[in-house]
Amino acid sequence: MTKLKIRAERNRTMTLTDNERYYYRSRLLSADSAEQFINRIIHGNLFDILPKLPSACCDLIFADPPYNLAKDFNGQKFKSSSTEQYADYLRSWLPEMKRLLKPTGSIYVCGDWRSAAAVQMVLEENFLLQNRITWEREKGRGAKSNWKNNCEDIWFATASNNFVFHVERVMLRRKVIAPYKDAPGVPRGWDETESGRFRLTYPSNLWTDISIPFWSMPENTDHPTQKPEKLLAKIILASSEKNDVVFDPFLGSGTTAVVAKKLGRQFFGVEIDDEYCCLAEKRLEFADSQTNIQGYSDGVFWERNTLAEQANSKRITHNKNQRQRVLLET
């Protein structure tokens, strides 16, 4: 029997009971039963599973491998190594990603400053490198002997020059600090709304609007490097279409699969840890009824700490729709 952690009453971190582990474990695929893999989680070693997956089976890959640092993933220890050794590790699986990806597909690979040189080098050996996204993590207290490590990178690459990318789906709604107007009093590039003054801006490769999952967020789990749903939503919306297949070879607690499901994509993922697989299955079940993504509403992404404005915008839209229905009925 697994001992449950004692948590504060308001802590919304997702956990598992022993009965839930038994139930969700029964839904997992194994390396020997991975043929029907669409919309499923495969529990096992990635290197055992990759040869059994068909070529050109996915449209988008999001890979968040163990970084080149010492880390404990629920007992699975990963040690830091030289840049050359880490590059060899990447070469052990990244070429297979090219085989699995469709000719019009894209791949995003996560890393930090230690792994930057190796990730870029090995990606360029196999794909067409398009960009590098840097996102602010906004977590941690820093150190006295060095600069606080406050960001991570995501490399964006494609199988060819013919790839999907929809920048209009990932616009960012920002508050207007200096509300300039043209001579007739017309707002210059911004809108006056009941919830404030906002401007829609094109996203850059520097993302400062992402919040790391924490105890008060229902998407939070005990996974040590869990990626935010908002981050995956940007990538999936920009680089895939409805019903496209999204693959995550290091699924962790399931964020990629959950967001793909919420956004109407198909998915599959591989994860070696039993506990994280079960958490991913539970999150997928909850995604049937909890379809919202924190920080994304009304078809746009919002800045951090704007939940009140988002809620007000939803109320305004709801009331406006109700008024329109009444007018139509009368």
Language model features with spans:
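PRPP-dependent phosphoribosyltransferase catalytic core
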Residues: 278-330
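Core catalytic lobe of class I
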Residues: 1-22, 28-279, 324-330
